[in-house]
Amino acid sequence: MENIDTWADKDLSILIVGFDGYKDVWDIDIYLLNKYWSNRPKTYLATSVLKPEYKNVEVIAIGEGSEWSKKAYNALKVINTKYVLLLLEDFFISSPVNNTLVLDSLHLINEYKIKFYQVLVQLIKSSWEKGTPFQGNKHIKIIPKDKKYPLNLQAAIWDREFLMETIGKGNYNAWQFEIKQISISDINVNKIEYLIDDRNILNIEHTIVQSKYLRAPLKRILKREPSIDIAGRDVLNFKEDFKYQFKLLMYSLTPQCLVKPFKKIGRWLSIDFVTDRVTNNKVC
């Protein structure tokens, strides 16, 4: 592991965009961040109104009524590094981060002027796997044009200015941001600028869906950190967890031409799809 005294000259910051109703999640997330990645870039937490104090984290309260986009955009105006590692508060770092892997990735991003470098893959199998290895590295793929959600809110290192342009000055939620990216068709056409790394270099566990803890990730984290207080939030029951895993499996393995038929099956099983809620303006 590379030992560095400071990240000040590495041109990278970390931005966690938080939802004020997840204060209990912030406490766990930042505890794990400080434990498993203590030597890291300057870290910011963007909130609406709450401004708790955390070690090694600068909290930026954007204002009441701020949705994901407004919090992210205004926090990015405060940050002055060229690149930003964008995270959500339910991305828990579950074991020590190897700074050598992070720095190697940052060097690659700098050298090839990459705008979007995704570092977390949750799908079992997806169109990204068809991407050509970048510079011969089988773990780093060129994002193909037909990838679902080519730009998304999985953990990723973004060019800060490009991220601000992509978000814009509106005030909307995270799901609406991702839905907007479905129609993007010029990914890596004239120049390679969008990559995906399947190594999970930050050792992230995505822990919460539908405001509840996922069973398997929570079990793994509690095995390592039994003292964590999860009393402020429910855990998905077996049926809810099954529905989520079924949906994830469907998106991972289903060809685009079969998504609509499989969604019909999912709705018959009372499975909720974010695209339906966004289309019906039910997400707030």
Predicted segments, located by residue:
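N-terminal anchoring/stem segment of glycosyltransferases
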Residues: 1-64, 76-78, 82-83
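Membrane-proximal basic amphipathic "stem/tether" segments
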Residues: 1-10, 223-284
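A broadly used, surface-exposed interaction patch
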Residues: 64-76, 83, 96-97, 101-105
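Short beta-strand-to-loop acidic/aromatic patch adjacent to the donor-nucleotide binding site
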Residues: 82-92
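Conserved donor-nucleotide/metal-binding helix-loop-beta segment in metal-dependent transferases, i.e.
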Residues: 96-126
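Short, flexible, basic/aromatic active-site loop/helix in glycosyltransferases
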Residues: 132-148
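Catalytic core and acceptor-binding pocket of nucleotide-sugar-dependent glycosyltransferases
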Residues: 150-216
